[in-house]
Each structure stands twice: as structure tokens, then as C-alpha cells.
Amino acid sequence: MASETEPNSTLTAEKSVAASPRIVRLQGGGLRFLDAHEIPQLDFNVVTRPFQNNNTQHWRLTNVGGNVHTIQQVSNGRFLDAHEISSLHFRVVTRPKQNNDTQRWRLLDFGGGFFQIQQVSNGRFLEATLDGDFQVVTGPADNNQTIWRQGDP
């Protein structure tokens, strides 16, 4: 049953996108998919890239309570995280497991496989940039680049 509430409304029902660990592709910024550099020289920066048939674009969503999840890159086991200071542009990176709110993400379901991903520690939203190297950052939920689509690997 569709909700009559606007997606950004505080009344939006927060539904869990994944009830148990599940591997998905996360599509954002047009025909681009969430991916990450796997070397320290690039700070394990998260980016979006065109479709690749490999597990660097596969992410394990694990529910840790309510609609809060950890998001783990399948290819290397590192967890989605983000810098929380503006001098680092709130860049999204992957890091080893830290068991803190910088690695916990609230999934706000809009239905039809579309949702927003909000970092629990600071309330900023995962955002796919469409310029430069297609870097992923966190920011306010004020544009379409914070809408993601979940798909099967």
C-alpha cells in the first residue's frame, strides 16, 4: 500500500530495506553504481562507476536494529564510512569494522527499490556527485543525488 506522505516528511514510515544480511548493488547518479578504490593511496574513497560485472560493486546490507544497517563491500570486507569534517569534504570511504555510528546507516525506503541512505552519526545523506571523479560524499537531503536504487547483484 502506497503512503500518502511526502518522502522527506518526518511522518515517513521508516521501513527496513533488508531484514537480514543481503548482497545488493546500489545505483545512484544515473547509470552508475556504488564502488570504492581498494588502495590506501586513494584513501579507499567511495565512487560511482559504470556497471562492472565484479564484486567491487556488491554490498552486504546487515540490519543492526530497526532500519539501521552496516554496508560492507563484498570484495574486501571493508565497511562504508565517511569523514565527518568539511576540510575532507565529507568524503565517503571504506574502513575496517569499527562498531560505531560512523559505520551505521539508516535506510529510508521510498518504495519501488528507491531509498535514501543516512549516516547515523551525523544525519548526513549518501550523495553521488556527478562531476570530477564521481566521488561519493555525505550531504543534506536537498537533491536527487541522495536517492539510491537497490538491485540484485
Predicted regions and their residues:
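Lectin-like carbohydrate-binding module/patch detector with strong preference for beta-trefoil
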Residues: 2-153
